Curated annotation (Swiss-Prot):
E.C. code: 3.4.21.-
Disulfide bonds: none
Lineage: Eukaryota, Metazoa, Chordata, Craniata, Vertebrata
Peptidase S1 domain span: 1-20
Residues that span the membrane, as ranges: none
Native source organism of the sequence: Gadus morhua (Atlantic cod)
Function (record text): Digests most rapidly at the C-terminal side of alanine residues, but also cleaves at valine and leucine residues.
Keywords on record: Hydrolase, Protease, Serine protease
GO terms of molecular function: serine-type peptidase activity
UniProt cross-references to InterPro entries, sorted A to Z: Peptidase_S1_PA, Peptidase_S1_PA_chymotrypsin
Entry protein name: Elastase
Signal sequence coordinates: none
Length: 20
C-alpha cells in the first residue's frame, strides 16, 4: 500500500497498477 502511495504521488495511473 505504501509503495502505491509513493507511486501515486509522482507516477501515472498505469505505473501505479504495476506497483501493486
Amino acid at each position: 500500500v505504501v509503495g502505491g502511495e509513493v507511486a501515486r504521488a509522482h507516477s501515472w495511473p498505469w505505473q501505479i497498477s504495476l506497483q501493486y
